[in-house]
Amino acid sequence: MTLATLCYIKRDGCTLMVYRNKKVNDIHEGKWNGLGGKFEAGETPEECIIREVYEESGLSIRNPRLCGLLMFPKFKGNDWYVFVFTAGEFTGELIDSPEGRLEWIPDEKILELNLWESDHIFMLWMQEGKILLREIRI
């Protein structure tokens, strides 16, 4: 089992997204995504997302809000559980991310991006302020 986090940072009607184009053999290459990654030993979901967002963007988020849990059975040969957060409070300046190009995308344009098919489902739920608990098969 793999535990991971995902965060969508909000500012002025926009969401910070990363266009994955930097890593070799990245399963997410060419897709837009939120920020996040795998847990380190002993971390809580909140500690993990705060660390991952900082490493990938240079932003220090405060008070991330848990808005869902996604389950990906047998993804890359393993069961993944992904804690999904949003955040609106942060400090810092964007860095040149090791994951890809960071960009503030207007919320009304997000569903037009090249996202994973499943992202369309939970992005709509998040925009409506709903809590999401869903199994997704890729």
Predicted regions mapped to residue ranges:
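Short, charged/polar surface micro-motifs in flexible loops or helix N-caps
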Residues: 10-14, 23, 88-93, 129-130
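Conserved Nudix-box catalytic region and its N-terminal flanking loop in Nudix hydrolases
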Residues: 15-51, 55, 138
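Active-site segment of metal-dependent pyrophosphate-handling enzymes
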Residues: 58-92
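NUDIX/MutT-family hydrolases
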Residues: 84-86, 95-126
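Charged phosphate-binding loop/patch that engages nucleotide di/tri-phosphates or the phosphate backbone
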Residues: 125-138
